[in-house]
């Protein structure tokens, strides 16, 4: 989530996304803070723009996974409740052209804990998500307690819970996917690094 207090700048940034779901952010600016570069990131790629102070945006470049000759999967945000009642969020990437029913599942765990998984193409593990989904796997990512972006109290819930409730959050995510009918409980793998 972003909040832009300058209404004119907010309008310019929103226009870059063209109404599509996207993360739009300023990546740099000059000393006058009037000319800047902005990035529009989706689950399919990123575009960088130069935003001159008084003229139309100029496309600087694109990083698009969709240029690959492969069917790309869509990543959707999900919400679930941990066994102790804590609300959790994450992301689910499903293979294209396959019924989302009892799929093999890879639980893709981010490092940290004081980082998080993100939706956009700039997210860590985006290429791995697409690789696995392209081969028929559902990919589940859970922002377990201690992940950044949910406030200090959420981060502090990780204290003393590295092999406890943080682990439970991941298991609860897999159980959620099984209960939704998306994942086959006999075909679950876990992958991650820090």
Regions picked out by a protein language model, each given a short descriptive name:
Residues 17-20:
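Surface loop/turn motifs at the tips and blade-to-blade linkers of beta-strand repeat domains
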Residues 12-15:
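Trp- and S/T/G-rich repeat-edge/linker motifs of beta-rich repeat architectures
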Residues 1-10, 44-50:
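Structural motif
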Residues 25-194:
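Serine-hydrolase catalytic core recognition
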């Amino acid at each position: 989530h972003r909040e832009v207090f300058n209404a004119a700048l907010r309008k310019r940034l929103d226009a870059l996304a063209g109404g599509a779901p996207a993360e739009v952010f300023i990546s740099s600016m000059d000393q006058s803070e009037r000319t800047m570069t902005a990035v529009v990131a989706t689950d399919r790629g990123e575009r960088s723009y130069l935003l001159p102070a008084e003229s139309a945006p100029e496309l600087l470049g694109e990083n698009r996974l969709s240029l690959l000759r492969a069917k790309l999967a869509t990543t959707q945000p999900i919400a679930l409740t941990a066994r102790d009642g804590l609300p959790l969020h994450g992301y689910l990437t499903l293979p294209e052209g396959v019924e989302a029913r009892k799929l093999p599942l890879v639980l893709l765990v981010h490092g940290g804990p004081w980082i998080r998984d993100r939706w956009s193409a700039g997210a860590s593990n985006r290429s791995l998500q697409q690789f696995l989904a392209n081969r028929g796997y559902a990919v589940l990512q859970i922002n377990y307690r201690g992940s950044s972006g949910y406030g200090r109290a959420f981060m502090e819930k990780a204290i003393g819970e590295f092999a406890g409730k943080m682990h439970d959050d991941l298991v609860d995510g897999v159980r959620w996917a099984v209960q939704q009918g998306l994942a086959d409980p006999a075909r679950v793998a876990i992958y991650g690094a820090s």
